[in-house]
């Protein structure tokens, strides 16, 4: 084993920036719709693509910002996790970059993340489950500023990805069929 990272729950599902993470996650049956490949791709139906990343946060620099500045970077209120109104939410806010509508529908992923930390560094371990890697790839491109619109996610000025991988997770039905 080259690396072992331990995540933990922090306060009321907040990450180490102090914001609640996963506020916009799909609920109920919408979770499966976002995360599981459907019958339109029968050989892979019931499976999911999983993208994982470990971010290191510059928390010392982040904590020098006041709450209002942090809220402008995230696009939500720190206390109640309420999305800022469009007229005051910057286009470079994290929420502005990752909430994407295509053909009148919001691209969905199911996200799960945990804060992690050592004596020397700390950040967020992130996993996205999705029926289409295109949604995750576009969110990531918009965060990193590679979509050609001249914008990037300001949160990336305080956070850097140090690891990342993408996997396909087959359905239990597919795995069971391998035994036969």
Feature-to-residue mapping (PLM):
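Long, histidine/aromatic-enriched segments associated with O2/redox biology
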Residues: 1-180
């Amino acid at each position: 084993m080259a690396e072992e990272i331990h995540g933990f729950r922090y306060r009321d599902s907040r990450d180490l920036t102090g914001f609640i993470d996963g506020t916009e996650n799909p609920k109920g049956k919408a979770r499966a719709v976002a995360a599981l490949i459907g019958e339109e791709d029968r050989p892979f139906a019931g499976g999911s693509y999983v993208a994982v990343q470990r971010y290191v946060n510059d928390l010392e620099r982040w904590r020098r910002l006041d709450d209002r500045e942090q809220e402008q970077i995230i696009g939500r209120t720190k206390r109640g996790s309420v999305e800022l109104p469009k007229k005051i939410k910057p286009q470079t806010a994290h929420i502005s970059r990752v909430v994407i509508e295509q053909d009148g529908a919001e691209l969905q992923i199911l996200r799960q993340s945990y804060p992690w930390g050592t004596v020397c560094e700390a950040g967020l371990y992130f996993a996205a489950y999705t029926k289409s890697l295109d949604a995750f790839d576009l969110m990531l491109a918009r965060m990193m500023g590679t979509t050609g619109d001249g914008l990037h996610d300001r949160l990336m000025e305080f956070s850097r990805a140090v690891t990342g991988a993408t996997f396909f997770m087959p359905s239990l039905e597919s795995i069971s069929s391998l035994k036969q």
